[in-house]
Amino acid sequence: MSDAWLVVGLGNPGAEYERTRHNVGQMVLDELASRTRGSFKRHRTGARTAEVRLGVAPGGAPGPRVVLAAPTSYMNVSGGPVAGLAKYFDVDVEHLVVVHDELDVPFGSVRLKRGGGEGGHNGLRSISKSLGDKDYARVRVGIGRPPGRQDPADFVLKEFSSTEKKDMPFLVMDAADAVEELVIKGFEAAQQKFHAPA
């Protein structure tokens, strides 16, 4: 197995989905690419990828090699491209991080999880099925629950509210920080940092 990490940002293709809640995972990837001056290229596995060094390792050495990947398929069928990327780059599930929107985390919060259920998230369900394994890390970017009786399926495909948009840069930066912490210092250290009370 390679020592590289595969960081996948979930979302839907097309300009009409670009700024929706469901695409927050890809917004985080764009932030990580911006930090590292990475540029995305089309990859034969059905994704846009950028190979970067993320952060600085202890001692000042360049951080770990990371493949940032945004599947170009619709989210609900993202498992095929993710499994293809893991195989192509020879990345074990221990080095796979999926960044996604999370209804069950309040807007503005970031939580980390390894393995377990998908919580009704069809993108995660597709990935788990295609990999035959659920034990990958997830960076759960909180979008909160829809107000009133709004259907969650409609809610995730809408843009953030004007109030939320003001806080989006901070949420995206926090989630990108969580990814960096995870790949440099490990899952437990990142989880402790991002789950600590403010």
Curated annotation (Swiss-Prot):
| Principal cellular location given in the protein's record | cytoplasm
Named from the GO MF annotations, one term is: peptidyl-tRNA hydrolase activity
A GO cellular component annotation here is:
cytoplasm
Top enzyme class? hydrolase
Q: Where is this site: Stabilizes the basic form of H active site to accept a proton?
A: 101
Binding residue positions for tRNA: 17, 74, 76, 122
InterPro entries associated with the record: Pept_tRNA_hydro, Pept_tRNA_hydro_CS, Pept_tRNA_hydro_sf
Q: Where is the signal peptide?
A: none
Instruction: List the keywords (alphabetical).
Output: Cytoplasm, Hydrolase, RNA-binding, tRNA-binding
Positions in coiled-coil regions: none
Gene Ontology BP term (one): protein quality control for misfolded or incompletely synthesized proteins
List the subcellular locations.
Answer: Cytoplasm
A Pfam family assignment? Pept_tRNA_hydro
- Enzyme Commission number: 3.1.1.29
The cross-references to PROSITE patterns, in alphabetical order and at most eight, read: PEPT_TRNA_HYDROL_1, PEPT_TRNA_HYDROL_2
Residues with site note (Discriminates between blocked and unblocked aminoacyl-tRNA): 12
Q: Where is the active site?
A: 22 (proton acceptor)
Superkingdom of source? Bacteria
Q: Report which reactions are catalysed by this protein.
A: an N-acyl-L-alpha-aminoacyl-tRNA + H2O = an N-acyl-L-amino acid + a tRNA + H(+)
Family to which the UniProt record says this protein belongs? Belongs to the PTH family.
The role this protein plays is: Hydrolyzes ribosome-free peptidyl-tRNAs (with 1 or more amino acids incorporated), which drop off the ribosome during protein synthesis, or as a result of ribosome stalling.
Quaternary structure annotation from Swiss-Prot or TrEMBL: Monomer.
**What NCBIfam families has UniProt attached to this entry?**
pth
Name used for this protein in its record: Peptidyl-tRNA hydrolase
Naturally occurring in which organism (per UniProt): Kineococcus radiotolerans (strain ATCC BAA-149 / DSM 14245 / SRS30216)
